[in-house]
Amino acid sequence: MNTRMVNPKKMVFLAVILLLPSFALAQPSNSNWLSQADRAKFDQLRISGSEALYNLDYEGARKIFKEMAIAFPNYPAGPQFLADTLLIEALYQTRRLQASLYNSDSFYNTSDDKPDPKLVDQFRTYTRTARQLVESRLKQYPNDAEALYFFGAIEGLKASFEETVERRHFAALKDGNDAVDKHRDVIKLDPNYRDAEMTIGLYDYTIGALPLAKKIAAGFLGHRGSKKRGIATIERVAREGNWVKEDSKTLLILLYTREKRFAEAATIARDLAAKYPRNYLYKLEMADALVAQAALERESNHVAAPSAAETEAFATFEGLVHDKNLPETTRKALDLIHFKYGEALRTAGLYDRAAKEFVASAQVVGAQEGLATMAHLYAAQALDLGGKRNDALTQYRAVLSRPNVYDAHEQAQTGLKEVYKRKMT
């Protein structure tokens, strides 16, 4: 597949969530890779590990997946799931485990933010082990759909890591495209292999979302897509898939949001938040979608009063900020929660309150450094929008005193020279 004609920024932005969390597995097939008894035991471990990971219990998930790797040494799921856990925990620790954080050009600029070499080495060890097991299987059984599905899943996992942790955009694009090719091969072997369609649907959507000129150029090279068809495919997987239903629903939150189908995004996020109560991320995604829906309604109806959607969103944030009985994973993410609350308030035009939440984010004990830098920047911009120039200048200077992340220093230097004005989209 030629990678040059696919807009790398758009492709990897979507690939971020492709397998995140990606502890789905190849759906049951006619493969005899595992005996019936082994598969029953394996399924128990898979379900337990998946539940732990969706609820952000990384240590619990890691323990289960290590047990899986030992119990089934010739099956790639154990090392693949261990790699998944490493990726998701790393993103949690750096506060990137939320789709809306990628919806900014800032993410694609250079920064001082570098991954831990030990993390990179461990991740590559796990994915290399998983891939070797898959390749060994394919040498014996070249048309094994389950092995090919694993192959594509591993390539997609590598793409997510390269994009979100290493920020190697073109490497992510290449591996993401390889994942699509492998899953297309799966469908050729088994047209009813529904889980493989998630990757294909995402690719279909991505090509369909390209600007017209690039879409035409991609078409000449044989790359065709449709946003409508891509979303429909992922919706079908969410309904009929075997082990990637939750992944597909998570992906739909992002795609619905990009298509301004905010109410539908909020509905899915609300359902997943109820199913996985210890996972605060779905609550944040729900609140994001509700705020965007409220802004859309306000623009359409020319009504300034808060809508029901906005009220629900703010109540969600207030609950996350002030609930004394929050799970530890949520308490440890208060920097992100305050940050997202600030974004919601800024969208609603409540700039003073937004600035306070951004400052609160930066001041959380143990706040992630990169997020704290961006929080100071966003506080400055909110203060500018609220007409408090002197306070804004203080926050811009705070940005420059901190490690650079994305293009924060560049934006802060611009902010010191001129009042920030909100971009109209």
Tell where the protein language model's regions lie, with residue ranges:
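Short coil/linker segments at helix-helix boundaries
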Residues: P28-S48, A52-I64, N74, T85-N143, ...
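Register position in tetratricopeptide repeats
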Residues: Y54, I88, L157, T206, ...
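Alpha-helical adaptor scaffolds
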Residues: K245-T257, D288-A292, E318-A372
